[in-house]
A protein has these predicted regions:
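N-terminal catalytic cores of NTP/NDP-binding nucleotidyl/phosphoryl-transfer enzymes
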Residues: 1-55
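Residue-level signal for inorganic ion chemistry
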Residues: 15, 62, 169
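Short, structured active-site "lid" loops
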Residues: 56-67
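Active-site cores that bind ATP or allylic diphosphates and position pyrophosphate for catalysis
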Residues: 49-50, 65-314
Length: 314
């Protein structure tokens, strides 16, 4: 099997910080005589929402900057919270032949290792403190350790995260009537600009939710049907039924706020409604990975049921 150097990201879109990561990873791959593979999330982002740029365009952006191959992670982020998808993605890369994983961070690899040890020792990878710097990189490192360190971990210094922010880049384009602003162009490789402009001209950007289907389900589904959908507990279902009718996204965000959902769980719950993801579907998916010893003890199905994260409680 060909040995791989792996990157995992959304790249929505690919900016110059990502370009640096790809170039450094390619250099490492050449030194080790390995192949550089970029793994991109497809369908739904790690933030449980639709992508601004579709998979095919992000695929082309990564190849244009030197990746040897682009693979996809699909079917995860409308079904599972991020901390559950990370070990699944790590395992997939290892099964594909990856020996190394490279990422960028503004803290060193030693700092990442030190902060990760607490979570490895406790076997708890869910409650990563929000004030942790580069907490996603810490989570990936900790879960790699949990899986027996199948991947050698590499870290390069990241660009200014406030400046090279995919969220801010996307917002700047949306706020400028779908024209890439001059200042934003400075943050993007030329190949990304060319692909973005082609996608904008073709009307494929930004990606959108299927709001018509979401409104239909939230307005018409019986209590019994809503109870089958993942990430909706009893209190939330009561609020959904009580607050009907839904005609715009804000009315949907508002009902989840009333049910005390935070932004991340709101996006995941709305994605579950959009794709009609059932509690049983999530349970079966998690059990299939438990059987492969991919899921940490604290994240197994029974623990999730005990915490009532996606099982109706009322």
């Amino acid at each position: 099997m060909l040995k791989l150097i792996a990157i995992s990201a959304d790249f929505d879109p690919v900016h110059k910080g990502h370009e640096k990561l790809i170039k450094e990873a390619k250099k490492l791959a050449d030194e080790k005589q390995k192949k550089l593979v970029v793994y991109l999330n497809k369908g739904y982002s790690a933030n449980h929402g639709p992508f601004f740029v579709n998979f095919e365009a992000r695929h082309d952006m990564a190849l244009a900057l030197g990746a040897d191959e682009v693979k996809s992670f699909e079917g995860l982020h409308h079904r599972l919270v991020l901390s559950y998808s990370v070990p699944i993605r790590l395992n997939k890369m290892y099964e594909d032949g990856a020996t190394d994983y490279i990422t960028s961070a503004h803290i060193s690899l030693d700092e990442i290792k030190n902060k990760a040890q607490k979570f490895v020792k406790e076997g708890n990878f869910v409650g990563m403190p929000k004030n942790y710097p580069n907490r996603n990189e810490i989570r990936w490192y900790a879960l790699n350790e949990f899986l027996g360190s199948p991947l050698e971990y590499h870290v390069i210094p990241e660009f200014n995260k406030e400046k090279y922010s995919g969220r801010k880049i996307r917002k700047s384009i949306l706020d400028n009537d779908m024209v890439i602003p001059k200042e934003t162009r400075k943050l993007l490789p030329k190949t990304t600009i060319d692909i973005l402009e082609d996608e904008i001209a073709a009307g494929r950007i930004p990606g959108q939710r299927n709001w018509a289907e979401i409104y239909k389900r939230m307005n018409t589904y019986s209590r019994g049907n809503l109870e089958k959908i993942a990430y909706l507990n009893g209190n939330t279902i009561n609020e959904i039924i009580k607050r009907r009718v839904y005609r715009d996204p804000e009315s949907i965000w508002a009902v989840f706020r009333r049910a005390n959902y935070g932004p991340v769980m709101t996006r995941l719950a709305v994605s579950a409604i959009e794709e009609e993801v059932t509690k049983k579907e999530v349970m079966d998916l998690m059990k299939s990975y438990e059987a492969k010893s991919v899921i940490p003890e604290g994240q197994k199905v029974q623990r999730v049921i005990d915490r009532a994260w996606y099982v109706a409680s009322e």
